[in-house]
Amino acid sequence: MLNPGYADEVKEWHKSHPDQEAHFFWDKKTAPPVFRVNDRLTFHRINDVKFLEYMQGCSGYVTTAGFESVCEAMYLGKPVMMIPTHVEQEINAADAVGAGAGIESTTFDVSRLVEYIPSHNADSGVFRAWVQSAEELFIRHLTTLV
């Protein structure tokens, strides 16, 4: 998920890496549903179904470290590069890095993610087990409060 303000940074990175196919989802309301910069760089307006389809097929995921999308990437075993923009995202990124989701960065230098991908441990089994136990954990925590 991309703040439209970062689009120029992504485009600049892509000029140096024109062979790298990249799809970004952004919340730019005035943009068309699909904005193709060239054959290898495309921006998509937010669409939850399309986002998950692309997430499932991607090699890696770049985000500002929003909780939900990082969890979706972890569930699918996708390596993540997180560029947090405020304190909540900084906390999410630190937690996700600690959980093995990927790496943290201060810029949209996607090359860092591309270099990281071969070393990423894509075993999402532990995370999936934790997700599956959520209902039980939630009920247990609620009942201990009563």
Regions found by a protein language model. Give the residues of each.
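Short, acidic/turn-prone active-site loops that include or flank metal/cofactor-
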Residues: 27-30, 47-49, 85-89, 108-110
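Leloir-type glycosyltransferase catalytic cores
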Residues: 101-146
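A donor-sugar binding/catalytic signature common to diverse glycosyltransferases
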Residues: 50-92
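Active-site-proximal loop->helix
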Residues: 91-101
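Small/polar loops that bind or transfer phosphate-bearing groups
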Residues: 2, 65, 84, 105, ...
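Donor-nucleotide binding loops and adjacent catalytic segments primarily
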Residues: 1-58
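Short hydrophobic/aromatic-enriched beta-strand-loop microsegments
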Residues: 22-24, 79-86, 104-105
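Anion (oxyanion) recognition and catalysis
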Residues: 15-18, 74, 97
